[in-house]
């Protein structure tokens, strides 16, 4: 005979598993959204012609990056492996962006910035997208 206690334990356990997948989906979705925002703002920055527009877009890049860093820091348990794999690429992505792409933009060399963004950065973006199962 099934006791009400085993039903309650099963219900709580089942709810916990359901909550975990929802939490992963929300966290991954937040990471994907922040990554897309950072990439979109950077691409807009490459195409912007005046410094004030570039500065405003750079602020958006930084804001999205900060949000993504925060989401990654909050990923624990089963999500920690994906976060670690993602973060390794994300750190490379940020370094290239901050040390090569953004300086090229501010020097007026949009073609060089775009070349880097469409090259190695695009490869990294694709890998990060895959790790988080972004859609």
Model-identified regions with their sequence ranges:
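Membrane-proximal N-terminal soluble sensing/regulatory segments of transmembrane proteins
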Residues: 26-84, 104-118
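Sec/Tat signal peptide C-region and signal peptidase I cleavage site
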Residues: 18-25
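Transmembrane alpha-helical segments of integral membrane proteins
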Residues: 100-101
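Bacterial N-terminal signal peptides
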Residues: 10-18
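Bacterial N-terminal signal peptides that target proteins for export
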Residues: 1-11
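Extended, amphipathic, non-transmembrane alpha-helical segments
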Residues: 92-96
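Extracytoplasmic
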Residues: 116-135
